[in-house]
UniProtKB/Swiss-Prot annotation:
Keywords: Protein biosynthesis, Transferase
EC number: 2.1.2.9
GO CC term, one of those recorded: cytosol
Tree of life domain: Bacteria
Presence of the UniProt keyword Transferase in the record: yes
Enzyme class: transferase
Native organism taxonomy: Bacteria, Pseudomonadati, Chlorobiota, Chlorobiia, Chlorobiales
UniProt GO molecular function: methionyl-tRNA formyltransferase activity
SUPFAM superfamilies linked to this entry: FMT C-terminal domain-like, Formyltransferase
Family: Belongs to the Fmt family.
Protein name as catalogued: Methionyl-tRNA formyltransferase
Reaction(s) this enzyme catalyzes, per UniProt: L-methionyl-tRNA(fMet) + (6R)-10-formyltetrahydrofolate = N-formyl-L-methionyl-tRNA(fMet) + (6S)-5,6,7,8-tetrahydrofolate + H(+)
Length: 314
């Protein structure tokens, strides 16, 4: 089986490595990724994507693409005569590209479709307080994330697990699912099931707007929102007109309580830093103020010199 793998971030790397280890006629003929990113320093070499680095380590051919809709790209894909195209965290492919695969093109998606269709399924699942998620492989079709499902694998979301941690776990779970999906396609027993659009939910791209913290919410909701955006792009608020990124929190009550404090108030109690939501206090554990390095919230609290007093955060 001739396989083309398309992907960019770390999420795609375990799948590439797992396919490369299959042997027995499962051959990666090309790895497609985005173009190298220029670094901030003028003298530094451009940065290759994680999947390109992994592909080169495996001595696999790599093609960097700028525009997947360029007709020339479809011609390049066709020239490799792929039996299957495997996509993991890549761009939206046009039919002219994915139709080049003789046995079909499938995507590895980090949710239990039709839940959380879109660019940020892991983040939104945690932000919404889900206790379970998983991965799905499905055949590509023109509408994004709507193709027929080949395989799914569920996993529980731990109460304190953040998006960065969960993405790593799902990438490894997904690699096993990708391998089994390829085996089923090769054996011509890849049974599929259509998605029920009535059960669909969205996971839109993360932006500066939808990652800002609204403190007028219950602390459990705030905790989920913050861990769902950690460590990147991170949830944020403002403090003294500067951006304050919040990386880690825990549900904890301070000894010095100010029950009438408005939402968004900061409190330092016994060296710990808390912020008030709509129904109580949330302990902050790790953060970063604009212009400074990431730090433990306790270190930030020591610089405030306001033990037992409530300050307005936003």
């Amino acid at each position: 089986m001739r396989i083309i793998v398309m992907g960019t971030p770390d999420f795609a790397v375990p799948s590439l490595q797992a396919i490369a280890a299959m042997g027995n006629g499962f051959d990666i003929v090309l790895v497609v990724t985005g173009q190298d990113k220029p670094r901030k320093s003028k003298h530094a070499a451009a940065e290759a994507s994680p999947i390109k680095q992994a592909a080169l380590a495996l001595n696999l051919p790599v093609h960097e693409v700028d525009d997947v809709n360029d007709p020339h790209f479809a011609e390049i894909v066709a020239a490799y005569k792929p039996d299957v195209i495997v996509v993991a965290a890549f761009r939206i492919l046009p039919p002219a590209v994915y139709s080049q695969a003789r046995l079909g093109a499938f995507n590895l998606h980090a949710s239990l479709l039709p839940a959380y269709r879109g660019a940020a399924p892991v983040n939104w699942a945690i932000m919404n307080g889900e206790e379970e998620t998983g991965v799905t492989t499905f055949f590509l079709q023109q509408r994004v994330d709507t193709g027929t499902i080949i395989m799914q694998q569920k996993t529980a979301i731990a109460p304190e697990e953040n998006a960065t941690e969960l993405i790593v776990r799902l990438a490894n779970i997904g690699a096993d699912v990708v391998v089994e999906t390829l085996r089923r396609i090769a054996a011509k027993n890849a049974a599929t099931a259509p998605q029920d659009d009535s059960l669909a939910s969205r996971a839109p791209k993360l932006t500066r707007i939808n990652t800002r913290i609204n403190w007028e919410q219950p602390v459990a909701t705030l905790h989920n929102f913050i861990r769902g955006l950690a460590l990147k792009p991170s949830a944020w608020t403002t403090f003294n007109d500067k951006t304050l990124k919040i990386f880690r929190t825990t549900l904890s009550t301070p000894e010095h309580d100010h029950p009438s404090a408005p939402a968004g108030s900061l409190l330092v109690s016994h060296g710990k830093l808390y912020v008030h939501g709509s129904d109580g206090w949330l302990e902050l554990l790790a953060l970063q103020l604009e212009g400074r390095k990431p730090m433990e919230a306790a270190d930030f609290a020591r610089g405030l010199h306001v033990e037992g007093e409530a300050l307005r955060l936003v």
